[in-house]
Amino acid sequence: MEAPPWEPVRNDSLPPTLSPAVPPYVKLGLTAVYTVFYALLFVFIYAQLWLVLRYRHKRLSYQSVFLFLCLFWASLRTVLFSFYFRDFVAANSFSPFVFWLLYCFPVCLQFFTLTLMNLYFTQVIFKAKSKYSPELLKYRLPLYLASLFISLVFLLVNLTCAVLVKTGDWDRKVIVSVRVAINDTLFVLCAISLSICLYKISKMSLANIYLESKGSSVCQVTAIGVTVILLYTSRACYNLFILSFSQIKNVHSFDYDWYNVSDQADLKSQLGDAGYVVFGVVLFVWELLPTTLVVYFFRVRNPTKDLTNPGMVPSHGFSPRSYFFDNPRRYDSDDDLAWNIAPQGLQGSFAPDYCDWGQQNNSFLAQAGTLHQDSTLDPDKASQG
């Protein structure tokens, strides 16, 4: 019997050779890893907030607000990846608001924390220089308003683009391009501003003392600033890169999905297997890593341990209970920062550290007075000596 002739047309139904296949167990394992990482960060931040109450720090401070924002961010990411355990399809077909809340709003929260850090460190610089340049204090209100305005712009751009992607008939790539152009520019500018603030603080003598009293160092602050700016800059470059590649038609034949996955997964209506893997890696590198570093750096410390550890507090500086975001005993308002005191008034400002010096001086003077009194009462002994 003669074999039927080979017809290449019938091979069109075969799957493409270069299409990647992610085994189900790999996807399930990555989902478990992502969920565990975000859940652990959530538990760690929750413990930090509990320590704020435990050590009786201020309830409302830069530190507590920062931790609350990170806690909300970690909870949203944990909920997002928990959806992929049971229903992968449902996780890709959320309503517009749920899509924005789980995919886009965590990026907004991360930007809010970056803005908050800029606001605080800029205010620290103002207060450190306020004795010699009092006119700097008048810029505090414009600084607050500018930070609020930038945060609102970032929020509105993300919300509008997310709604248009899910409901409108607009070109998806155009919408994402607008979002990337505005939001990533703000990210990079805030990261650069943060690095400049940290650099200025590292050059200030009072700031160095303040960092040492917290148990950190200028090297740690510099490392955190450089890491943050590099991560956020590379994030913006990645988003621009995938936008450029997604417009090249002949690249689509490879169908690897990674060039279509932005940091908010808004370039694809359905996140495929490979796209899901890339999305998780993107969030790990540009969200989980910098947030974890900053949360750990600004964690709540035990004041009792700081008091018993002489290496944590320099002999020339701040009270050991001074922290980056709050002082649980002295600060009733931001105007009570110790840096508002001139250097010549350090003895009155940092009384806890200088009490020991005063006691040593008093004991020395007392001994000198005793010797002088003895020599006065017995002049013969003095002359014989």
From Swiss-Prot:
Membrane topology (Cytoplasmic): 54-64, 118-144, 195-222, 299-385
Inducing or repressing factors: Up-regulated during osteoclastogenesis (in vitro).
Any one biological process term the GO annotation gives: autophagy
Lumenal side: 1-32, 86-96, 166-173, 244-277
Subcellular locations according to the entry: Lysosome membrane
Transmembrane segments: 33-53, 65-85, 97-117, 145-165, 174-194, 223-243, 278-298
Alphabetical list of InterPro entries matching this protein: GPR137
Quaternary data: Interaction with RRAGA; increases RRAGA recruitment to lysosomes. Interacts with MTOR; this interaction is amino acid sensitive.
Protein name per Swiss-Prot or TrEMBL: Integral membrane protein GPR137B
Source organism of the structure: Mus musculus (Mouse)
Gene that produces this protein: Gpr137b
